[in-house]
Structures are given as structure tokens and as C-alpha cells.
Regions:
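A recurrent flexible, glycine/aromatic-enriched loop bordering the glycosyltransferase active site
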Residues: 74, 150-184, 206-207
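Acidic donor-binding segment of Leloir-type glycosyltransferases
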Residues: 34-69
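Short, well-formed alpha-helical segments that are part of the catalytic scaffolds
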Residues: 20-39
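Acidic donor-binding loop at a coil-to-helix junction in glycosyltransferase catalytic cores
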Residues: 177-179, 200-216
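Short aromatic/hydrophobic "clamp" motif used to bind/position activated sugar donors
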Residues: 89
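Conserved donor NDP-sugar-binding/catalytic core segment of glycosyltransferases
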Residues: 101-146
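Glycine-rich, basic loop-to-helix element that forms the pyrophosphate-binding segment
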Residues: 69-85
Length: 339
């Protein structure tokens, strides 16, 4: 499924708008993003900037942006893309650079492969060092796969596996992606009702895998997602949404995220049989025990059990939460036509 840029016909008869989430602190990287959007071969109809409530409008402006005061939270600000009325929407963070023909090429890829959304590969896991890959597996069972013409696959444990050797410039189907940027059909975006997941925003920004949940909601509701390798789209990484909590709190909330994402996106799906659920549980137990062993070693080295206990307590509290009235009352992850 490798893409040849010379074999994709130019199609420019489409309209889209951009939805950016920001707290207004990306600085020069935000300017680079805006300028790259203004330089697109197909211009956006609107550039909506969903600025978190209480934060000042960035001094850096290009001129076409429309600022929308939005409740603070990664999900609240992303779900605000619902206001887009054009046929397509480009949903992005505030620190992404796009080559001038990037949006046009993403549109053309959707037509060629009959897909609903496409995300550029802005976090190339396949390029990690050996030690980084080993660490990713030990802490989170993230692992590489041979080139099977898929990009990201989600394992039963909730962790992802990545294509270790994608073809240069390839476009492959995927089950997840970095949340940095995605171009998709607006009707599909609205169909998944991402606003139903605003419960995530009660957790500190940067501790919850809300992007994985977003993409899996697209997949589990029957839509097709692509990943584009070597696109030239760059995550400039302004570091504005990293977790502020350190040590204990950070580990605790990430452990909660790990369990809740697994439960909502993997375990508690209507298509699962009893056998599927058992396999999912066993996979998660393996992931949990492996990550506990790593945190045990770290706790020993730091002469403190807190790093291990934070991970365990996060999982325990997450398990309690999915049995609570608050969680049970959430709308279904896989939506019925009436929802």
C-alpha cells in the first residue's frame, strides 16, 4: 500500500477547516504552524483556535485565525472541532508544521484508499534506538512487528505494536496514531461523539491516553483510518501539555489511564465473547506484572516503595472507578445508530 506521489492525481475540489487546541504558549512553533497552514495548496475555509478558558490569546498571529474560548481540557478542546461545517476537518495541536501540499495529499489518499481519516506519522516508533524500544516493551509492552502493511495495531493488553520497517512514503491502515494531527471527514468526526469522553479531562493533562481512545473510537465504530509515513509533517513539540505531576502522582494517574483505556477500548466492547474477555484479561495481567517489576527495580534503586505503590494503587482505583455510577452512566463507546 505504498504511495507514489506521482500516481496520485491532483484533486483540489474540496473544502476543509482547521481546529487547533492550545493554551497559547507554543510561541514560534505556533507561528510556524499557522504559516504552513496559510501556505497550503488548498487553503482552509477557517482556522478555529480553541483557546483554553482563562488563557491569554497568543501575541503571535498570522491573521486568519478565529479564536474560540473553550473549557480547558484536552478532550473539551478537541471535541470543540464539532463546530466545523465543511466536508473535511484537520484536527491538530498547536505545534505542527505542514509541507505546502500536505493537506491536498491527505485528501487524495482518503479518496484513493476509500478511508475516513488519515494521520501523518509524527512519532516514528520504528526509529527509536534499541534501548528505547527495550524500555518501551518493559514498561508498557509496546513492541515492533515485521512489515505486514499495517501501521499501528492495538494489542489485547491495550498497548500498541508498531511497524518496524514501513516502506518509504507508505500509507497503511492503522488502529491508532499520534494525536498531533488527523485529517478526516467531518461527518465521521461528529459521528463518534468525542464529546462523550470529556470525563477524561478530570485527570491531569499529559497523563491520560486520550488520543488512543479517540482513534480507537473511530475504529470500533466502523470507520477506516490510515497512517502516512515520511509525510514531511513535523511535530515541533512545544511541550505545552506535558504532565505537571512528578514521581508518585504522575505514575498513579498514568496507571489509572492504562487500566481505563484498556477497559473502555478493549475489554468492555459489545463484540467480545467470554473467551475474548478472558484473553484480554490475561494480556493485561501480563502487562501489569511486567510494568510492576520495572517499577519495583526503580523503587529499590530510589530506596522508596512509592513508585511501585503508585502504579498498583492507580490500577486498583481505576478498577473501582469502572464499577462506579459515574462510569456506568457514560454513553456507550460503540454507539448505536440512535446515539
Amino acid at each position: 500500500m505504498a504511495v507514489d506521489k506521482f500516481n496520485i492525481m491532483r484533486e483540489s475540489n474540496f473544502k476543509y477547516s482547521v481546529a487547533i487546541r492550545t493554551v497559547g504558549k507554543a510561541g514560534d512553533k505556533y507561528i510556524q504552524e499557522l504559516q504552513s497552514l496559510h501556505n497550503q495548496t488548498v487553503k482552509p475555509e477557517h482556522i478555529y483556535v480553541h483557546l483554553a478558558h482563562g488563557f491569554e490569546r497568543p501575541k503571535e498571529q498570522v491573521g486568519m485565525e478565529e479564536y474560540i474560548d473553550t473549557p480547558k481540557g484536552l478532550v473539551h478542546q478537541r471535541a470543540a472541532a464539532n463546530m466545523v461545517e465543511e466536508e473535511y476537518v484537520l484536527i491538530i495541536d498547536d505545534d505542527v508544521y505542514f509541507p505546502e501540499d500536505a493537506v491536498e495529499k491527505m485528501y487524495n489518499a482518503l479518496q484513493k484508499y476509500n478511508a475516513d481519516g488519515i494521520a501523518p506519522d509524527t512519532f516514528p516508533s520504528q526509529s527509536m534506538s534499541f534501548f528505547s524500544k527495550a524500555g518501551a516493551y518493559l514498561t508498557n509492552t509496546v513492541k515492533g512487528r515485521k512489515n505486514d502493511e499495517w501501521a499501528i495495531r492495538i494489542q489485547r493488553s491495550g498497548a500498541f505494536s508498531f511497524n518496524s520497517n514501513p516502506e518509504k512514503g507508505a500509507i497503511y491502515p492503522t488502529e491508532s496514531a499520534a494525536g498531533t494531527a488527523v485529517f478526516m471527514k467531518t461527518k465521521v468526526w461528529k459521528a463518534i461523539h468525542y464529546e462523550h469522553e470529556v470525563w477524561i479531562d478530570k485527570y491531569p493533562a499529559g497523563t491520560f491516553g486520550e488520543d488512543q481512545l479517540m482513534y480507537q473510537k473511530i475504529i470500533e465504530n466502523g470507520f477506516k483510518l490510515l497512517m502516512w509515513y515520511d509525510s514531511g509533517v513535523l511535530h515541533l513539540d512545544a511541550n505545552t501539555n506535558k504532565a505537571s505531576q512528578k514521581s508518585y502522582d504522575k505514575i498513579y494517574y498514568r496507571a489509572m489511564s492504562q487500566y481505563l483505556t484498556w477497559y473502555r477500548c478493549i475489554y468492555d466492547l459489545p463484540r467480545n465473547t467470554s473467551a475474548d474477555k478472558l484473553k484480554n484479561q490475561l494480556a493485561y495481567v501480563y502487562r501489569f506484572l511486567l510494568s510492576c517489576s520495572v517499577r519495583l527495580v526503580y523503587s529499590i534503586l530510589q530506596f522508596s516503595p512509592r513508585f511501585l505503590t503508585a502504579h498498583i494503587k492507580g490500577n486498583i482505583d481505576a478498577r473501582k472507578f469502572v464499577k462506579s455510577e459515574e462510569y456506568i452512566s457514560l454513553p456507550h463507546f460503540v454507539l448505536s445508530p440512535k446515539e
